[in-house]
Every structure is written in C-alpha cells, then in structure tokens.
A protein has these predicted regions:
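Glycine-rich, acidic/polar active-site loops that bind/position phosphate-bearing ligands
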Residues: 1-162, 167-175, 180-375
Length: 375
C-alpha cells in the first residue's frame, strides 16, 4: 500500500481494504442479529475474467496508431468479422495454444490460479479467467496477469492489446467482475440453498445488494467510466451504460410475492426436455445469464460486466463494497432494534425490494423499450 506522510491514500489498495473492512463489519452485525454468531470474518470474493486481443508483432509495428494509442484510429473493416459467431469458443490454434500454455506456467509460478482460457466473440480475441479469491489478493493478481500477459505474448512474436475498443466493427474487450460474500468457513452468503423461499438470510443480502445498486447507481457507473470503456459500452456488444440487475424468473417471482402477498411463493421447477430418450430431463438454469445486463445474478454471485479490460478492478469493487456496506448498516440497525427479528427481517426484505425493484430488468438491455423505461 502507498500512502503519504499525512496518511492520505496514494493508491487504490488502501481504499479497497477500507471498503472490505466496512463491508465485513456490517455483514457481521447482520449475521449476529440473525443469530449466526459463529462467523468471525467475512471475505469479499471476486473473480475477474480478462479479455484481450492478440496481434502479430510484425503487423503491429507497421501501425503507428496501434503503437502510440493501443487501438486503431483509421482503416477499413475486416473482410470477415464476427457475423457467423464462429470464433467464440472455437478451436484454439497451435501458436496461441503454445502461448497460453506458457502464460499459465508463468502465472502459476506467481501463485495466480489461472484456470480457463478460450476464444472470444471477435477474431483474435481471447479470454483468461482465474479462480476467485479474496478481493485484495484477486485485484493484485489481475494487475500481475495483465503485465505477464503482455510480456509472454512478445516472446511468441505477438502483442496483447488491452484497450477496450482496439478495432471498429467487432466487439471490444472488458473484464467481468464476479462478486460474492463468504464467511471464513466457506459459507457463501449469496448461495440460495435448497429451500430458497425460506432462506431469509439469502433474501436479505440479495435485496440489500439490489437497494445498493439502485441508490448508488451513479457511483457504480462511474466505476467503469473511462475514455476507452465508454466507447465500448452500450453498442450492442457490451452491457448497456444504464445500470440494471438481472435476477431471472424464479427470484423475481419470489420477491414479487413477498411484496404483493406478504409471503414467499414457491417458484415453479422447470426442466429442459431435448426430446431424445438417451438424454435425461435436466433442471433449467433459472439464472440464465442475460448477456445484455450490466449486473446479473449467476447462481451464487453477482457478475458485474461493465469493467474495462485495461482497468484495475479495485475501483469498481471499492464502490460495490461501500454501497452494500451502507445498506447493510441500515439493515443491522433495524434488526438490532427489533423485538421480533424474523418479522423485521421479512419487513426489511419487502421494503428493500419494493422501494428499489425498478432497477430489476430481465429483458433485452439493448431494446428501445428499456431505454424509455429507464428514463
């Protein structure tokens, strides 16, 4: 951490650590009020996914705009772009595969648990993801990853571009910030459990996040605001610049029932039927993932998709941590003053959702209807 002689923070690590401590304090207060007294520590887990482009260095050296700005400033559109969606998750070529193998080796030597890599939507665009970790550590790992990524690419005669919009006509690059809370024994506070409708703890933390994103939406948006990233957001290739949350049908119906009827209605179980006897009926993934939403609940975490590929994930997580901590403080104050904690928990869930459900949008974030509704 870097700070001045007078104690002013000179980097993003100090504010990030402060935000995690504030969030830990309020989360422990809420858990204690709910009777969960065993928890002593709260860990803010994040898992950034890093997108990037690879360009052959001999072509890179011929482009002054790429060398000076990290992006193209002029030129023609490629003869073939991403129209057929045939690049995404396609077979990785030998040259890039060898590069990725060495990249993984170098990252593992640094203690960075790189796990997955695949082709992204645009030609020569790729992604690497690491195993989630505590926010402070994961932020450091992502900074190191970007540096090692560029260094290893040069060894293989390529240049890794981290600019959010290096080429016109194809997708830009970002990084998805997967965010969740857990106790020191590994209990995920955003895991719905088997009886979702009866899990008041989960519903309380869920609605607290919803309220935080609504009340502090300008800060959450500012966390992803850079010149390069603003050029990428909202162009039907990345999440829209309007802050919204995708919950999925089941969670939305349960929260609507609490608001309208005062109790939890059990969500309908849905199954995927392939019409083939050799394949069983499988439970439908009720969280979907709605790629047009800037923030989506994906099973046991929230995925914040607006962060730019060259950004530090510290800033966005400082804002998310601080916003959620502020709302949890309100919840803790109410629970600690309540005579009937369970009843008050129901009331908090209802109040948080009823007052801030406007930020929930499960439809197409690129549609004109959503832009009109958001206004």
């Amino acid at each position: 951490a870097f700070f001045s002689y007078n104690g002013q923070a000179l980097d993003k690590k100090v504010p990030l650590l402060r935000s995690t401590l504030a969030l830990e304090k309020q989360t422990l207060r809420v858990l204690k009020a709910l009777g969960k007294t065993k928890a002593r520590r709260i860990i803010v887990n994040i898992g950034p996914e890093q997108e990037y482009f690879l360009v052959d260095k001999k072509f890179y050296d011929q482009r002054a705009d790429l060398r000076l700005t990290g992006r193209t400033v002029m030129g023609n559109l490629a003869a073939k772009g991403q129209e057929l969606n045939d690049h995404y998750y396609g077979t990785i070529g030998d040259r890039v595969s060898v590069f990725m193998s060495e990249l993984n080796y170098e990252l593992w030597k640094l203690g960075i648990s790189s796990k997955t890599q695949h082709k992204e939507a645009a030609p020569n665009q790729f992604e690497i993801a690491v195993v989630y970790d505590a926010a402070n550590l994961s932020t450091d790992h992502n900074q190191l990853l970007m540096d090692v990524l560029q260094m290893v690419a040069l060894r293989h005669g390529m240049v890794a571009l981290l600019h959010e919009k290096p080429f016109a006509g194809v997708n830009g690059s970002g990084k998805h910030d997967n965010w969740s809370l857990a106790t020191e024994d590994g209990t995920n506070l955003y895991a719905p459990g088997n009886n979702l409708e009866e899990n008041l703890q989960f519903l309380l933390f869920l609605t607290a996040f919803i309220k935080a994103m609504d009340v502090y939406a300008p800060l959450i948006r500012a966390g992803a605001a850079t010149a390069g990233n603003d050029h990428r957001l909202g162009s039907s290739e990345a999440p829209p610049a309007i802050i919204s949350i995708y919950l999925g049908e089941q969670l939305s119906s349960i929260l609507d029932a609490i608001t309208e009827e005062g109790n939890c209605a059990k969500g309908k179980s849905q199954y995927v039927k392939m019409g083939i006897t050799a394949l069983p009926e499988l439970p439908k993934d009720l969280t979907d993932r709605n790629r047009t939403s800037p923030i989506a609940f994906t099973g046991n975490k929230f995925e914040y998709r607006m962060v730019g590929s060259s950004q530090s994930v510290a800033g966005p997580n400082i804002y998310i941590n601080g916003a959620v901590a502020q709302v949890l403080q309100e919840a803790a104050d109410r629970l600690e003053a309540a005579d009937d904690v369970e009843l008050e928990c129901h009331n908090i869930i209802r109040d948080f959702y009823q007052g801030h459900k406007r930020i929930i949008f499960n439809g197409n974030g690129y549609s004109q209807e959503w832009k009109a509704e958001a206004k």
